[in-house]
Amino acid sequence: MVTRAGAGTAVAGAVVVALLSAALALYGPPLDAVLERAFSLRKAHSIKDMENTLQLVRNIIPPLSSTKHKGQDGRIGVVGGCQEYTGAPYFAAISALKVGADLSHVFCASAAAPVIKAYSPELIVHPVLDSPNAVHEVEKWLPRLHALVVGPGLGRDDALLRNVQGILEVSKARDIPVVIDADGLWLVAQQPALIHGYRKAVLTPNHVEFSRLYDAVLRGPMDSDDSHGSVLRLSQALGNVTVVQKGERDILSNGQQVLVCSQEGSSRRCGGQGDLLSGSLGVLVHWALLAGPQKTNGSSPLLVAAFGACSLTRQCNHQAFQKHGRSTTTSDMIAEVGAAFSKLFET
Ligand SMILES: *[C@@H]1O[C@H](CO)[C@@H](O)[C@H](O)[C@H]1NC(C)=O
Ligand SMILES: *[C@@H]1O[C@H](CO)[C@@H](O)[C@H](O)[C@H]1NC(C)=O
């Protein structure tokens, strides 16, 4: 307990110092005192919120135990991967394993399967997504899966998207949690009804994907000065589906609460970082729903899971950047998952 509080304070301190120096550099001496006070009050408050929410994430993590059998800590399915894109589904699926899932499946187009298998012997790869039976082929696995991550490396081929639509429908019918990213979000922007009101869905749009969804669902441009309000409104308009807007700070809402994750990352953004987020979120969503609302102190389990995945991704980015600087890539970030996880959640 003592070391946990210590680590939290150290991280919090670093954030305050970074923010204050940024403020001072920007505004110069006359505004110093005022800004400093305003900043430290506001930041101290949001850092306390962050630390409280991290504590809730720690509550949902299942203890490692020798009495459990394989598969109990999570069997995750990634739906994505086509001829053009094979990296994204690999990154999402391997991230799920590294975070603590026992098994990670990839349901991809047939051309992508040998490539993804060759990246890793640790994944189970099903070359079914472009088959006429795709929906049935995935559905028969659903009773054995705890969560689906839909979209990494999916592409926009009509036939594939039709199959994914069917997969989302059967997943909903079986109450399987779904994390939707990348071209999965493109599909949702075409047909918001697919996930409208589904409380076990989490959407993880970047800025472009967010604007497209906002446009499609609220039929008007968003107010770029009010990102909290925009995320809240999109979530509500989708029937309180959890939305995670990725950005300089990640903004999360379930239509009721808005959380901000500003865990220190780095200014390096590489393609693939979103796959680390969606893959780890698949596992955390399963753990959070398993733990239930008592463990999350009344907050939405999905929101707590999303906060955990955002913090973890940013911490991985931070650690990888310390070692590799500009040359940091997603593989370097994934190599940090173990250390980042224990720093945030097990210290
Ligand atoms: C749990 O909820 C109570 C009441 O809302 C709040 O006072 C407390 O700070 C929360 N604890 C954590 C760890 O978030
Ligand atoms: C979403 O949450 C808001 C705030 O609690 C509530 O007013 C609204 O009725 C909810 N919408 C749905 C569809 O449940």
Swiss-Prot record:
The enzyme's E.C. designation? 4.2.1.93
Q: Return the PROSITE patterns for the record.
A: YJEF_C_3
Write out the annotated subcellular location.
Mitochondrion
What are the disulfide bonds?
A: none
Glycan-carrying positions: N240, N297
> Phosphotyrosine (modified residue): where?
Y85
User: In the UniProt annotation, what is the result of changing R326C?
Assistant: In PEBEL2; decreased reaction kinetics for ATP-dependent NAD(P)H-hydrate dehydratase activity; decreased affinity for (6S)-NADHX; changed ATP-dependent NAD(P)H-hydrate dehydratase activity; thermostability assays show that activity is lost at temperatures above 30 degrees Celsius
Q: Per the record, what are the reactions this protein catalyses? A: (6S)-NADHX + ATP = ADP + phosphate + NADH + H(+); (6S)-NADPHX + ATP = ADP + phosphate + NADPH + H(+)
Record-listed ATP binding positions: 246-250, 265-274
Q: Which GO terms describe its cellular component?
A: mitochondrial matrix; mitochondrion
- Keywords, in A-Z order: ATP-binding, Disease variant, Glycoprotein, Lyase, Mitochondrion, NAD, NADP, Neurodegeneration, Nucleotide-binding, Phosphoprotein
The Swiss-Prot or TrEMBL record lists the needed cofactor(s) as: Mg(2+)
Coarsely, its chief localization is mitochondrion
The broad enzyme category this protein falls into is lyase
Record GO biological process: metabolite repair; nicotinamide nucleotide metabolic process
Q: Which GO terms describe its molecular function?
A: ATP binding; ATP-dependent NAD(P)H-hydrate dehydratase activity
What this chain does, per the record? Answer: Catalyzes the dehydration of the S-form of NAD(P)HX at the expense of ATP, which is converted to ADP. Together with NAD(P)HX epimerase, which catalyzes the epimerization of the S- and R-forms, the enzyme allows the repair of both epimers of NAD(P)HX, a damaged form of NAD(P)H that is a result of enzymatic or heat-dependent hydration.
Name the linked condition. Answer: Encephalopathy, progressive, early-onset, with brain edema and/or leukoencephalopathy, 2: An autosomal recessive severe neurometabolic disorder characterized by severe leukoencephalopathy usually associated with a trivial febrile illness. Affected infants tend to show normal early development followed by acute psychomotor regression with ataxia, hypotonia, respiratory insufficiency, and seizures. Disease course is rapidly progressive, leading to coma, global brain atrophy, and death in the first years of life.
What family name appears in the similarity comment?
Answer: Belongs to the NnrD/CARKD family.
Q: What else is known?
A: This protein may be expected to contain an N-terminal transit peptide but none has been predicted.
Q: Which HAMAP family match?
A: NADHX_dehydratase
Q: Could you tell me what this protein is called?
A: ATP-dependent (S)-NAD(P)H-hydrate dehydratase
